[in-house]
Amino acid sequence: MSKITKKVYPVMGMHCAACANNVEKIVKKQEGVEDASVNLAAAVLTVDFNSDVVSPEQLKDAVMKIGFDLIIDEDNSMEEQEEAEHSYYEQLQRKTVVAWIFALPVAFMGMFFMDFPGINWWMLVLSLPVLFYSGHAFYVNAWKQAKHFTSNMDTLVALSTSIAFLFSLFNTLYPRFWYEQGLEPHVYYEAATVIIAFVLVGKLMEEKAKGKTSMAIRK
């Protein structure tokens, strides 16, 4: 006789309905899982599974493969979730501050100093911390989603900023390509950096609101 267990596990890293849907889908695909549902507001996964076929550790591994995390330590799940949420919020704050410190000069240069010699190189250098530090998680999560043929908000941010940055990088390195066509090589570093900065602000506000909501639900 199969042993069906019903568990509720906190999920870390979800930001939208697509995230919740992707977590639900990946868990349901696991052998031994009878049913699974995600509550985005409370940030929890409710799952019915055959503990003889699949373990909580295997469910956690499956969820981590698409860029999220599952807290399976039932004895300390509440404390661990609160700790993880606080740590993530502080990290998000740092990344948001760094993004704006570099994005504002890039945007300012793009508006007022485009005729300044070597300005594209300055904008390139200032864009790097925004994309590769502040925006790093967008690209990692988008890649994890892509490997499982799914997508979420991170996919949109990663695609739009990558296209803007790579096109600008090409125009910075090979401006002659456009000059030979009789065209001016334009760059869009400010678009890539400002998108990341604004989305991070949104995530920060969302995380704060979500923390209050989930705390109220737990009470």
Regions inferred by a protein language model and the residue ranges of each:
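Transmembrane helix-loop-helix hairpins at the membrane interface
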Residues: 91-219
